[in-house]
């Protein structure tokens, strides 16, 4: 085999490979001989079909098979001999493959860059932490109890106030004429609640059971009924009953009714949930800070093929958000050229950071265990109650789909490794500060 390097430009490499025709001829004859041992043909005993007849019947197919195998073997050998690390699958193009002549083909590829791992011990990070207070546990339990509140009719003669529930009949009109979908009977309206036209519920505050009132509202510009969007309308309101929510008393009996031995166990459950939530937010913040530090030091070139693939995936998501009208305000104000440039820079950063994280893991023998994979699968199944069996069967039938789980696991294990070496200082912050920007 003869290999000539034709391109060395940045991370791009090009080669011309020539495999002697004699090698191909030898492989073809060997393959034909193998076929002759099993080939059956009328008039001949099994394995006794003349090689000339085997060649006539299978010659072209064997030639194609041998050529493909030779290209693959020669490419792999060439890459291994030169210790190349392709970024993506090499591009191979056959130049010459005539019978009884040498096989000539070209190989073009991008190699992974030389990645220098920064001194992880020199990295300093701050890890925000927000201790759970007794008052916050009280608030969490109170919200839980409020969700299980029952309603009761208000018997005293008083006007409706924020937090009350007013049972009403209403009739909407435009220019004095009732419009479709604008009427309701015995409808419970929570004063101060959401989900109504702005100003609708608010104008019912102060009404008493038995009273009537005409209110005026303006429908939102983005209202689902186009004929009403941005239009003014009136509603005839008849208040029929005033109700209020009565939250259950938070005591041992309430705790027992919800599956706990006593109030102390109930409080511990909520304390643990709050702690877990904050531990997750704290972990996310310090992980982001670490990855930002690593990204700053990932100053090696990024393979264009990987950047192109990453950008294509990002841009598909951007286009989907744009079509759904969910593009954020900042991006919506940019022209496409600027938007593409911004997201290509993000794609390049992701590729560089991914290569650095991969190199840290490879160099330090970070491994994904079967236990890691089981935990990840259990976590995924917990997100879809009742579909556990279907998810398990999916992964059993599609082993390559497990790569989607391996990536995040590997990244987290590398982060754990790096955090053990870095200097991490805990800083107490408020819960609001801890959770700020954690949903980006």
UniProtKB/Swiss-Prot annotation:
Entries under NCBIfam families matching the protein: tig (TIGR00115)
Enzyme class: isomerase
Lineage, top ranks: Bacteria, Pseudomonadati, Pseudomonadota, Alphaproteobacteria, Acetobacterales
InterPro entries: PPIase_dom_sf, PPIase_FKBP_dom, Trig_fac, Trigger_fac_C, Trigger_fac_C_sf, Trigger_fac_ribosome-bd_bac, Trigger_fac_ribosome-bd_sf, Trigger_fact/SurA_dom_sf
Record remark on domains: Consists of 3 domains; the N-terminus binds the ribosome, the middle domain has PPIase activity, while the C-terminus has intrinsic chaperone activity on its own.
Protein family: Belongs to the FKBP-type PPIase family. Tig subfamily.
Keywords: Cell cycle, Cell division, Chaperone, Cytoplasm, Isomerase, Rotamase
Location of this chain's protein in the cell: Cytoplasm
GO cellular component terms, semicolon-separated: cytoplasm
Location, primary (coarse class): cytoplasm
Protein name: Trigger factor
Annotated GO MF terms: peptidyl-prolyl cis-trans isomerase activity; protein folding chaperone; ribosome binding
Domain PPIase FKBP-type, residue spans: 163-248
């Amino acid at each position: 085999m003869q290999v000539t390097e034709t391109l060395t430009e940045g991370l791009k490499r090009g080669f011309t490979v020539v495999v002697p025709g004699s090698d191909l001829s030898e492989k073809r004859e060997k393959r034909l001989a193998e076929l002759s041992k099993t080939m059956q043909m009328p008039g001949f005993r099994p394995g006794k079909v003349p090689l000339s007849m085997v060649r006539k019947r299978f010659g072209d197919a064997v030639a194609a098979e041998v050529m493909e195998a030779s290209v693959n073997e020669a490419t792999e050998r060439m890459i291994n001999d030169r210790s190349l690390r392709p970024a993506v699958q090499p591009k191979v193009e056959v130049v010459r493959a005539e019978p009884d002549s040498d096989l000539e083909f070209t190989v073009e590829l991008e190699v992974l860059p030389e990645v220098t791992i920064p001194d992880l011990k020199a990295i300093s990070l701050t890890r925000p932490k927000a201790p759970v207070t007794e008052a916050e546990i009280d608030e969490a339990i109170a919200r839980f109890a409020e969700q299980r509140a029952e309603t009761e009719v208000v018997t005293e003669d008083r006007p409706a106030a924020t937090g009350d529930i007013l049972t009403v009949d209403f009739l909407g009109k435009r220019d004095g004429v009732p419009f479709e979908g604008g009427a309701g009977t015995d409808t419970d309206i929570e004063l101060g609640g959401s989900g109504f036209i702005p100003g609708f519920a608010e104008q019912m505050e102060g009404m008493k059971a038995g009273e009537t009132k005409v209110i005026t509202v303006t429908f939102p510009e983005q209202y689902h009924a186009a004929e009403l969007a941005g239009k003014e309308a009136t509603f005839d309101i008849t208040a029929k009953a005033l109700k209020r929510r009565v939250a259950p008393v938070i005591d041992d009996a309430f705790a027992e009714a919800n599956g706990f031995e006593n109030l102390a166990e109930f409080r511990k459950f909520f304390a643990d949930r709050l702690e877990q939530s904050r531990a997750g937010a704290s972990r996310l913040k310090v992980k982001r800070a670490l990855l930002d530090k690593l990204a700053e030091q990932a100053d090696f070139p990024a393979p264009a093929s990987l950047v192109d693939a990453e950008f294509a995936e990002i841009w598909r998501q951007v286009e989907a958000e744009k079509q759904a009208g969910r593009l954020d305000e900042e991006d919506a104000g940019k022209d496409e050229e600027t938007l593409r440039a911004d997201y290509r820079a993000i794609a390049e950063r992701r590729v560089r950071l991914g290569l650095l994280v991969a190199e840290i893991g490879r160099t330090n023998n970070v491994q994904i265990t079967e236990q890691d994979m089981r935990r990840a699968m259990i976590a995924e199944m917990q997100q879809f109650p009742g579909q556990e069996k279907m998810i398990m069967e999916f992964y059993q039938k599609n082993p390559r789909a497990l790569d989607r789980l391996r990536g995040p696991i590997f990244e987290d294990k590398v982060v754990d490794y790096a955090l053990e070496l870095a200097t991490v200082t805990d800083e107490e912050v408020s819960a609001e500060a801890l959770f700020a920007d954690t949903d980006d």
